[in-house]
Amino acid sequence: MTIAERCHTTMRFLFIISVMLVLAAPLGAQDFAKGLQAFEAGDFAAAVKEWKPLAESGDSSAQNSMGNLYYNGQGVPQNNAEAFRWYRLSAQQGNVDGQGNLGWMFEYGLGVAQDFSRAAKWYKRAADQGDGWAQNSLGVLYYHGQGVQKDFGQAFHWYKLAAAQGQLYAHQNLGWMYEHGEFVDRNLLMAFMWYDHAANRGLTDAAEARDSIGTRLSYLEKLQVMGMSKLCMGNAYKDCGDAPRSRYSY
């Protein structure tokens, strides 16, 4: 696989506390919060005790949370099939995290037969709800032509949407596409900028790619990139535009 990567397995299953509290059903919000408090304290058995009844009663956030517990083997025996079952119940109710997680399970054949087309279907549903992780994952499927027709334009489109939300792997993937001129004109200034955003948040592959490009840029070009980068971050990654053509654009 090229540097255009999906995020590491564990990142999909990190709990986003604010989102989970907002999505919790009003009638079960207090119990959901108790489960979340127990989870954060490392008392996974107590989290199961609070979340499982909610999940069985149809709470989509609790269903997704039970899927996470089964996926990671926290408070319950690790069981991908059970994780898949809970994610599917959550996703079918329109829960964005459940949809993204279900896409992941289909993509990697976890608890279910691998099916890229179904992975794309569920990633698309989550992506359409604005989930940056799912947007990047859908972009990767388009990039590689897995479950969808290979389309660099669609890959770039979804990477851009994900990048606008600060999704660091999307930043890395945009860097790759600018470096290699895939769908967009090759532009090492833009590639350097996007790699730098990802590298500054800990992606070593992005750091290596950035540093390699850096050896080919002049001092003035590096200053230009710094200005572009500040503007991009100041716009919360939503309007980063294209850089002027560098000596290495064509």
Predicted regions and their residues:
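Terminal, low-structured helical/coil segments at or just beyond the last alpha-helical repeat
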Residues: 204-250
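Short helix-capping/linker turns of helical repeat alpha-solenoids
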Residues: 42, 56-59, 72-74, 79, ...
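N-terminal secretory signal peptides that target proteins for export/translocation
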Residues: 1-11
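Hydrophobic face of amphipathic alpha-helices that form TPR/SEL1-like repeat modules
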Residues: 31-38, 53-54, 65-72, 76, ...
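N-terminal leader/linker segments that initiate helical-solenoid repeat arrays
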Residues: 27-50, 61, 241, 250
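Bacterial N-terminal signal peptides
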Residues: 14-24
